[in-house]
A protein has these predicted regions:
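Conserved catalytic core of nucleotide polymerization and phosphodiester-bond processing enzymes
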Residues: 1-239
Length: 239
């Protein structure tokens, strides 16, 4: 039985970065949820109606990126993100500056013609899309790429800042970080100090760098005998 929680999670992951019906159906299958096409369309429409900020954000990113590309050297912005295109670097590279100041690079920006596919099969039609060079081949650049990279990159920068604060604080030496996994920090602690460590992790995880002031942030903590993947955001590994 499909729960609203499951569908809501899949919808957020599939649609938040510009995905539509196809992306929702594909991600739902990954979570072993079967959706009919009509049902998926209804979910997409409902999600976008409930999240009007999303399409405004996507279009703002794309407009800023294209405006920067049109005039090399000009800096454009979309909220806290900035873009600049250098035609004399890496074969023509678009840069996106994250709120932290870190730059993401899209080198050798080019238009290309690609086959239109439906249900994984070519239709015989062609379309033109913007693409950039990757380690292996080229990848499409569209508002979904920019949105995903901006959100994931900013989240990673916030997590790195948290890790640095914990690891450089002598008072927290009793809870060494053993690893990070996506949006999780895993510490090794004694069982006697588990509650103390969880409170500290929560405090540190909810402390934003100055450049991230005002961004929404949530945290969940858990202590366990050994690491396991679950629905929590932070874990303290008790020993």
């Amino acid at each position: 039985m499909k729960s609203e929680r499951q569908i809501g999670k899949v919808a957020t992951l599939a649609l938040g970065f510009g995905g539509a019906v196809g992306a929702l159906l594909a991600m739902a299958l990954g979570y072993r949820i079967h959706l009919e096409t009509a049902e998926a369309r209804h979910i997409v429409d409902a999600w976008r109606a409930a999240n009007p900020w999303a399409q405004e954000f996507w279009s703002g990113l794309w407009e800023a990126a294209m405006s920067a590309w049109e005039i090399p050297g000009r800096i454009t912005t979309a909220g806290r993100l900035a873009f600049i295109y250098r035609d004399d670097y890496l074969g023509g590279a678009l840069f996106m500056a994250l709120p932290s100041g870190r730059l993401l690079t899209y080198p050798r920006l080019r238009w290309r013609e690609v086959d239109v596919r439906k249900d994984g099969k070519p239709t015989g039609e062609k379309r033109t899309e913007l693409s950039f060079r990757r380690a292996h081949g080229r990848a499409r650049l569209w508002h979904g790429t920019l949105c995903e990279n901006a959100v994931s990159g900013t989240a990673a920068d916030i997590l790195r800042a948290t890790v640095t604060r914990i690891e450089t604080n002598p008072a927290l030496a009793f809870m060494p970080i053993r690893m990070t996994t996506h949006d999780e920090i895993v510490c090794e602690i004694s069982a006697a100090r588990a509650d103390e460590a969880k409170a500290i992790l929560r405090r540190e995880m909810l402390t934003l760098p100055n450049w991230a002031d005002g961004l929404p942030l949530q945290s969940e903590e858990q202590s366990c005998r050994r690491y396991s993947k679950s629905k929590t955001t932070l874990k303290g590994e008790a020993s």
